[in-house]
């Protein structure tokens, strides 16, 4: 009883006032935590917390943190509790499900997917080296380019997995795998991926908070981008100018060609982040890993006999990775979108609304890297991909219970939905009555502040 009298209370409205850098509070299970100073040390990045600032973040916290993380909360507790703390039926069921998965050990039983994938990556790399260095046939070189593209896809899946949970027994080894599979093998910084990907997960399909939807002037999934909205992630305006209008007017035609060279933009984004003034965890290690890639890859290409074959080799290897770039878009482009920050109180609902699953046979799971179960992954990002197919029926049943969407489309259907979404926006972009701003070519590479 004495402890009860010492409690101090705030309302949810009071909590919302502490939602900016320097004055940043969050609540978890009714207890309030002041993370104003600590937010810069957050392993998942500042953006993830800033997106949910001044709110209850219990569901997101459960989704992204292991049980050991709860022990670190008490030192951030400022003594306040939320007086009108309320848990919805959806959240209550979600938390029960997460607890059940934890009790069954699903978050800890990682299987051997990473080992198998890295073994395949090693075999493909050996085949690529042999094809380029020991063969003179152009067909051998083309096959090597295809294998290199597939290698990059599978390596990216390992980087993705290791970024969400520890795929090995130790954190240092996990970090090494991140750098090898991301920076060294693919040339894409794991630091950049974590920065954008964590924000994407938290603010799934928010037009102004989710960086994975912000592709002006190349693509726009919603006509709301035509108002030149401000990206809360990049901290700059996404200008809808004459260049954007022209490109977006034909985006349903240019989608697949752009995906074939989309890797170039990821290289640019990596360099822009690593050499920016932003705080980048392990910046030196990330730069070192990128230097490894830009040493072996150009060197490998240089062993090809002429510039024509070199160009074809690079283009084919990049084009193969378009399969993965397209998949990322299929999971979200045709799903529901919204503007504004995510709401911690309907976190589960926002994840179901903003994602699409891709249906496939179990023998194709390796090809999609588990991301065909996009909703399951978004709800339980720490869940090893070997369990996603197992939990899928349970998630589907929970969505059905609460009348929430659970959309699982074939690869063909998902492409049709995506192209339809792009076409609808393209037709609207051609409307001359929509005002545009002055052209800024530099917007084409999503520059960072």
Curated annotation (Swiss-Prot):
Transmembrane stretches, start-end: 113-133, 138-158, 176-196, 255-275, 284-304, 311-331
Organ and tissue specificity: Highly expressed in flowers and siliques. Expressed at low levels in roots, leaves and stems.
Motif Histidine box-1: positions: 160-164
Sequence positions that bind heme: 42, 65
The keyword Ribosomal protein is assigned to this record: no
Entry's Gene Ontology cellular component terms: endoplasmic reticulum; endoplasmic reticulum membrane
Ranges in a coiled coil: none
Keywords, in A-Z order: Electron transport, Endoplasmic reticulum, Heme, Iron, Lipid metabolism, Membrane, Metal-binding, Oxidoreductase, Sphingolipid metabolism, Transmembrane, Transmembrane helix, Transport
Keyword Glycoprotein: no
Histidine box-2, short sequence motif: residues: 197-201
Location of the motif Histidine box-3: 374-378
Molecular function GO terms recorded: metal ion binding; sphingolipid 8-(E/Z)-desaturase activity
Disrupted gene: phenotype observed: No visible phenotype under normal growth conditions, but mutant plants show enhanced sensitivity to prolonged low-temperature exposure.
Catalytic activity annotation: an N-acyl-(4R)-4-hydroxysphinganine + 2 Fe(II)-[cytochrome b5] + O2 + 2 H(+) = a (4R,8E)-4-hydroxysphingenine ceramide + 2 Fe(III)-[cytochrome b5] + 2 H2O; an N-acyl-(4R)-4-hydroxysphinganine + 2 Fe(II)-[cytochrome b5] + O2 + 2 H(+) = a (4R,8Z)-4-hydroxysphing-8-enine ceramide + 2 Fe(III)-[cytochrome b5] + 2 H2O
SMART domains in the cross-refs: Cyt-b5 (SM01117)
PROSITE patterns for this protein: CYTOCHROME_B5_2 (PS50255)
Entry superkingdom: Eukaryota
Biological process terms in GO annotation: cellular response to cold; sphingolipid biosynthetic process
EC number(s) stated in the UniProt entry for this protein: 1.14.19.29
Topology within the bilayer: Multi-pass membrane protein
Domain Cytochrome b5 heme-binding: residue ranges: 7-91
Cellular compartments annotated: Endoplasmic reticulum membrane
Record's function text: Plays a major role as delta(8)-fatty-acid desaturase which introduces a double bond at the 8-position in the long-chain base (LCB) of ceramides with or without a hydroxy group at the 4-position. The enzyme produces both the 8E and 8Z isomers (in a 4:1 ratio). This structural modification contributes to the quantitative partitioning of ceramides between the two major sphingolipid classes, glucosylceramides and glycosylinositolphosphoryl ceramides.
Family membership: Belongs to the fatty acid desaturase type 1 family.
Domain writeup: The histidine box domains may contain the active site and/or be involved in metal ion binding.
Protein name as annotated: Delta(8)-fatty-acid desaturase 2
The species this protein was found in: Arabidopsis thaliana (Mouse-ear cress)
């Amino acid at each position: 009883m004495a402890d009860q009298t010492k409690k101090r209370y705030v309302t949810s409205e009071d909590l919302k006032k502490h939602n900016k850098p320097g004055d940043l509070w969050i609540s978890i299970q009714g207890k309030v935590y002041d993370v104003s100073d600590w937010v810069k040390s957050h392993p998942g990045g500042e953006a993830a917390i800033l997106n949910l600032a001044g709110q209850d973040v219990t569901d997101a916290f459960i989704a992204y943190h292991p049980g050991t993380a709860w022990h670190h909360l008490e030192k951030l507790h400022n003594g306040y509790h939320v007086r009108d703390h309320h848990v919805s039926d959806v959240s209550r069921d979600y938390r029960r499900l997460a607890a059940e998965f934890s009790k069954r050990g699903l978050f800890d039983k990682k299987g051997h997917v990473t080992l198998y994938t890295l073994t395949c990556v090693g075999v493909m790399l050996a085949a690529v080296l042999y094809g380029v260095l020991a063969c003179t046939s152009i067909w051998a070189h083309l096959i090597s380019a295809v294998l290199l593209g597939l290698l990059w896809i599978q390596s990216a899946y390992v980087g993705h997995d290791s970024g969400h949970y520890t795929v090995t027994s130790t954190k240092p080894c996990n970090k090494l795998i991140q750098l090898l599979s991301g920076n060294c093998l693919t040339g894409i910084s794991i630091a950049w991926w974590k920065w954008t990907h964590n924000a994407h997960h938290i603010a799934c399909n928010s037009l102004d908070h989710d960086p994975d939807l912000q592709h002006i002037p190349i693509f726009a999934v919603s006509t709301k981008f035509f108002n030149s909205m401000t990206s809360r992630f990049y901290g700059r305006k996404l200008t809808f100018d004459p260049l954007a209008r022209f490109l977006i007017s034909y985006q349903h035609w240019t989608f697949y060609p752009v995906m074939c060279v989309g890797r170039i933009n990821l290289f640019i984004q990596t360099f822009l982040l690593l050499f920016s003034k932003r705080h980048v965890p392990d910046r030196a290690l990330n730069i070192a890993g990128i230097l490894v890639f830009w040493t072996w890859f150009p060197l490998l290409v240089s062993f090809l006999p002429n510039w024509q074959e070199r160009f074809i080799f690079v283009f084919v290897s990049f084009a193969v990775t378009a399969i993965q770039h397209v998949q990322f878009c299929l999971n979200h482009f045709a799903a529901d979108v919204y503007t504004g920050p995510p709401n911690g109180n309907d976190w589960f609902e926002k994840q179901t609304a903003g994602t699409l699953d891709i249906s496939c046979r179990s023998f194709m799971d390796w090809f999609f890297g588990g991301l065909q179960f996009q909703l399951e992954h978004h709800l339980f990002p720490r869940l090893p991909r070997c369990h996603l197919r197992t939990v899928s029926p349970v998630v589907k049943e929970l969505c059905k219970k609460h009348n929430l969407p659970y959309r699982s489309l074939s690869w063909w259907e998902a492409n049709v939905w995506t192209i339809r979404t792009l076409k609808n926006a393209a037709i609207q972009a051609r409307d001359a009555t929509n005002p545009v701003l002055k052209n800024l070519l530099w917007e084409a590479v999503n520059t960072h502040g």
